[in-house]
Amino acid sequence: MIYYLLVPLVAHFSALNVFRYITFRSIAALLTALVLSIVFGPKFIDWLRRLKFGQYIHEDVAAHKQKAGTPTMGGLLIAFCIVVSVLLWGDLANEYVWMTLFVFLGFGALGYVDDHAKVVRKQNKGLTPKQKLLGQIVVSGVAAALLVLDPEYSTRLAVPFFKHLTPDLGLWYLPFAMLVMIGASNAVNLTDGLDGLAIGPMIVNAAMFGLFIYVAGHAQMARYLQVMPVSGVGEVTVFCGALVGAGLGFLWFNAYPAQIFMGDVGSLSLGGALGFLAVLCKQELLLIVVGGLYVAETVSVILQVGYFKMTGGKRIFRMAPLHHHFELMGVPESKIIIRFWILSILLALVGLSTLKLR
């Protein structure tokens, strides 16, 4: 909105030319989302308390019982701040911006239904796994189809550290892109079990993929760094900036001890958006590295369930996802969170190194 109001005036006021730059508008979106989060956060938390939208806690983790009743569905605050910031600072004529918002809000709507069902039923169960998966398939399928049907969008796959290895998946790219989005969404959802555990790495991941998206959308940079170019995708950097800002603002209240939880409306939407960002900048496989924390949490659940079924009741971990295993080992929650954040930053640096190590 601001973009369209001020850019036409550049001919009269040259200083306004700064609003043409994606980098400036991305920083502006970050600051806008951050301020909105911090300003509206307390009022939003009070509103959730009045509605009695409290979190129902996993009974198997005794230390979590004190968190019962903490306001949930904080993802609505994140969504509000991101959408407002993108609408203010983004180029709304860019199709990739709208596609990203569609995925973000689509997965968020699914999470909202799930959260609302939990609140109404007064238990820690919402949608069934099949219902949730069906919704994810629909949202990711529409987004992936729009990309595959775009003649200017490549269905080639970039392999980290190998600049000349770019296999073309053709129509198989559609289910692959869907898998990336659904997998990322569920992975973030599984990770969201401790105060600030999911949002911290999300901020790091959003910043990292914001950089890759900016490079992919800049023809000269993409050529120099040998990254697959995607014309027009650079504008989505504004969304990434807004996500980082909203994430920082939410962390202000979600840090241990949390005053609010993001709920499924937050974890599913952020995870789905993260997967789509990786797809947009042609760095789908890099998400496994940069989002390694989310991958580890998901793999721990898969291994636990599989081993439990194969052995008739035996377990690899004391509890899955992985963060609960460390909790039951006696590691303080705050220490688990900080250590996982550190690992996330290190993994992001490994991902960043792929820009030159090819």
UniProtKB/Swiss-Prot annotation:
Cellular component GO terms held in the UniProt record: plasma membrane
Protein name, UniProt field: Phospho-N-acetylmuramoyl-pentapeptide-transferase
UniProt entry tagged with the keyword Translocase: no
Biological classification of the source: Bacteria, Pseudomonadati, Thermodesulfobacteriota, Desulfovibrionia, Desulfovibrionales
GO BP: cell division; cell wall organization; peptidoglycan biosynthetic process; regulation of cell shape
Major localization listed first in the record, in broad terms: membrane
Primary role: Catalyzes the initial step of the lipid cycle reactions in the biosynthesis of the cell wall peptidoglycan: transfers peptidoglycan precursor phospho-MurNAc-pentapeptide from UDP-MurNAc-pentapeptide onto the lipid carrier undecaprenyl phosphate, yielding undecaprenyl-pyrophosphoryl-MurNAc-pentapeptide, known as lipid I.
TM stretches of this protein: 27-47, 73-93, 97-117, 133-153, 165-185, 196-216, 233-253, 260-280, 285-305, 335-355
NCBIfam families xrefs: mraY
Listed cofactors: Mg(2+)
GO MF terms held by the record: metal ion binding; phospho-N-acetylmuramoyl-pentapeptide-transferase activity; UDP-N-acetylmuramoyl-L-alanyl-D-glutamyl-meso-2,6-diaminopimelyl-D-alanyl-D-alanine:undecaprenyl-phosphate transferase activity
Protein species of origin: Solidesulfovibrio magneticus (strain ATCC 700980 / DSM 13731 / RS-1) (Desulfovibrio magneticus)
CDD domains cross-referenced by the UniProt entry: GT_MraY
Pfam family, one: MraY_sig1
Family: Belongs to the glycosyltransferase 4 family. MraY subfamily.
Domain of life: Bacteria
Keyword Cell inner membrane assigned: yes
